[in-house]
């Protein structure tokens, strides 16, 4: 099995010192050999110097500016494909893996599907909240999943949404679907990628026997801001599983939800942010239409 695969791990970092040893250290203990590529998005801490000193076998692609999560990953994916990667393991800077995680995933690789482990919290004592609410609870055949899990059966389970903290992607998917969409800087780019996978009838699965950890429980939740509003509207507008008419209806439904929240919570500071986000949306309507067409085509977009 180990000779058959050439797996590159892509990690995008920005001021990642608090996690870097757990993240990269876990990869060094993998039962399947992994090539590690770090794309640093212009960190202002000691991240790049530390990696160069303590992890000389890691390929470090240091950027002079913050490209964002998606475009940083695209830099790494482009590099890995040029080196002959058969698979890409996208791993968050605040995530780490069990030694046998990749080994547990590979038997379920069909060349056409995204595979993910289950995501535990950084403490490892419970499921990550996002994973539980979106991947697990939206899994197909949920009752069968519970039965299988209880008696120790091993399967993969289809679901609609898994955040990109730990994704295993075969080269074929990248060649046919492409990289992350440049219309997103940070957040929502993984949801857009899942929309594209579903549109093109590619699988999205998780394997309960494979485990990764995502340490975000202690990260303070950011307040609602203009960038979030803008990206949520873009996400709805360019979802190719919806017609243009329905996509715009979903965008306006989101706008109404913000207005209701502003009134209910008496957070009237939302209103100028929403107004500015809508102005930005008005300027990218044609770009959104063109982007939708691009996503519908089979090609290695943005790589």
Regions found by a protein language model. Name each.
Residues 135-159:
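Short, flexible, basic/aromatic active-site loop/helix in glycosyltransferases
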Residues 226-233, 243-303:
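Non-catalytic, C-terminal membrane-associated alpha-helical segments of glycosyltransferases
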Residues 85-96:
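Short beta-strand-to-loop acidic/aromatic patch adjacent to the donor-nucleotide binding site
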């Amino acid at each position: 099995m180990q000779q058959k695969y050439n797996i590159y791990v892509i990690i995008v970092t920005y001021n990642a010192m608090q996690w870097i040893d757990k993240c990269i250290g876990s990869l060094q203990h993998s039962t399947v050999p992994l090539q590690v590529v770090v794309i640093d998005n212009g960190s202002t801490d000691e991240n790049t110097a530390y990696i160069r000193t303590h992890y000389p076998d890691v390929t470090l692609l240091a950027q002079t500016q913050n490209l964002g999560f998606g475009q940083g990953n695209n830099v790494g994916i482009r590099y890995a494909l040029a080196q002959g990667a058969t698979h890409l393991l996208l791993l968050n800077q605040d995530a780490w893996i069990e030694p046998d995680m990749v080994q547990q995933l590979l038997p379920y690789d069909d060349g056409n599907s995204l595979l993910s482990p289950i995501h535990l919290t950084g403490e490892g004592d419970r499921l990550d909240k996002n994973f539980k609410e979106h991947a697990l609870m939206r899994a197909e055949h949920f009752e069968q999943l519970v039965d299988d899990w209880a008696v120790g059966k091993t399967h993969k389970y289809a679901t609609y949404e898994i955040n990109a903290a730990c994704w295993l992607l075969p080269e074929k998917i990248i060649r046919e679907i492409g990289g992350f969409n440049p219309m997103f800087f940070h957040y929502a780019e993984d949801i857009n990628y899942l929309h594209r996978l579903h549109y093109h009838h590619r699988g999205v699965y998780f394997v309960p026997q494979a485990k990764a950890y995502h340490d975000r429980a202690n990260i303070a939740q950011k307040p609602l801001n203009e960038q979030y509003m803008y990206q949520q509207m873009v996400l709805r507008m360019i979802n190719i599983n919806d017609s243009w008419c329905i996509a715009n209806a979903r965008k306006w439904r989101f706008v109404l939800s913000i207005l209701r929240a502003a009134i209910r919570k008496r957070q009237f500071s939302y209103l100028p942010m929403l107004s500015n986000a809508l102005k930005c949306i008005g300027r990218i309507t044609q770009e959104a239409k063109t982007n939708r067409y691009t996503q519908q085509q089979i090609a290695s977009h943005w790589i």
